[in-house]
Swiss-Prot record:
UniProt name for this protein: Large ribosomal subunit protein uL2
Species: Pseudomonas entomophila (strain L48)
Domain of life: Bacteria
Entry annotated with the keyword Ribonucleoprotein: yes
Record-linked SMART domains: Ribosomal_L2 (SM01383), Ribosomal_L2_C (SM01382)
HAMAP family: Ribosomal_uL2_B
Listed PROSITE patterns: RIBOSOMAL_L2 (PS00467)
Matches recorded under PANTHER family: LARGE RIBOSOMAL SUBUNIT PROTEIN UL2M, RIBOSOMAL PROTEIN L2
Amino acid sequence: MAIVKCKPTSPGRRFVVKVVNKELHKGAPHAPLIEKKSKSGGRNNNGRITTRHVGGGHKQHYRLVDFRRNDKDGIPATVERIEYDPNRTAHIALLCYADGERRYIIAPKGVSAGDQLIAGALAPIKAGNSLQLRNIPVGSTVHGIELKPGKGAQIARSAGASAQLIAREGVYVTLRLRSGEMRKVLAECRATLGEVSNSEHSLRSLGKAGAKRWRGVRPTVRGVAMNPVDHPHGGGEGRTSGGRHPVSPWGFPTKGAKTRGNKRTDNMIVRRRK
């Protein structure tokens, strides 16, 4: 994987920084594992905008990714290829199991075409293998972690993400997340060894506003540029700073205000994130 800085042959290419991976599959995705993906333009069934800054963008197909891997225990799989997925920052890997079935998984870092992967309690400690947390050694790096047994991976799924298993006590294990948070998870939950691929994703630069539009992201208008009817920061004579602590268009504090409200699982968090 290489970081390529484009030559400034035009204003739109002057600031472009690409992440080039020559191992990525250049053809179409595996047809049985794709589904139609409709665009909402950020509107709900009443046609009203419920999510701002959404609309347009290139047409995409959704890739059906296996986040559970619990019904293929003990069946070895070969990595056929690594693919780009427009629906996520990580790359995906197409596995061909010994029984002939093919499935997509989140591609772990260091896994390439031809590698052998397996899931289950007897799987060796190797990047890309999926085990229950009770069977993973303390100190290991993991990703694709379940919060409820059998529900599928929910933690550490984006490019370069991972967590470290730092303790095992009774029916729980303790994980240290990239955010600095330490939390307990049931040892029955599954995780995949290693970290997620495409860790260089954060080093790229789109270079121009149009590249953001290709991805279906519309412009964000500053509150201080609006009228008072549209935003709490709006109005004023000339250019103003808003005159109050930063808030959302609905008056809720923004820029760092804590929004977590799930008291039911507070006891699972050993240390809050930084």
